[in-house]
């Protein structure tokens, strides 16, 4: 708009100045001096208008970011918290009761679960039964209202969060990816990983099959949240991350849901490699996902109603 208005103003200026020159009321050299001065002043004025746009965009961004900066973390550490030391990675839920701040009713009620070290434990039940909540309590995305969760007889509530999460890998159906290269997305948790380690993780997660077909292979940008990848390809990158991290505790939240049979078969093979001899908690609706489980808990309305 400003460019158009400036063009119109210059056209009018030349038109009226020409009439004044023809009548002898304006000298030609004065006209060109004024026109040159006006053109020199145009760029700074235009920059001011652009600056105003940039300032407004910055203010709009600040309004979105400031609430995040001011957000108070619901999970707080105490000065007495210590680094957790994990050997067998046996996880126990002891009389856990939990409800979200936004709800009145309890989501989990007196839950007792033993997750065997180096074994696979599965949670089954209807949607909304509380399975994902159980899984999210282990890395302390939330803290329970009553009871305790221990790993190798150490309470996670007296452990430093960073040391706890360092030993946990999460693979879910909603994989979070960044607008970066394939390499950096795999090495998200291990920033100093070598190219050889990254390629090895991709190999065992079957991600190398599609990575080798990408234009720049491991240097290919995958777009915001991996928009250039399919659902199965995103899952394989997520598993590659977990393989590279080598965590002792693996959490799988419906990792093979919404996938076709061929893709699910590859994902399942990758999961089998990932979870071998590691403490694993699986949430799934498909029978194929829990066939290799050492123990199964049935969850209904926030309670354990069966195990075997």
Predicted ranges, named:
Residues 1-11, 54-57, 74, 97-99, ...:
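An intracellular "coupling" helix at the cytosolic face of ABC transporter transmembrane type-1 domains
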Residues 6-13, 57, 194, 248, ...:
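Residue-level signal for transmembrane alpha-helical positions in Major Facilitator Superfamily
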Residues 13-17, 44, 61, 207:
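Hydrophobic/aromatic residues in alpha-helical transmembrane segments
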Residues 78, 84-308:
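ABC-type nucleotide-binding domain
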Residues 1-33:
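A hydrophobic transmembrane-helix motif
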Residues 40-68:
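Cytosolic ends of transmembrane helices, especially the final helix of ABC transmembrane type-1 domains
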Residues 67, 74, 187:
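Conserved E/DxxT/N motif and adjacent residues on the DHp alpha2 helix
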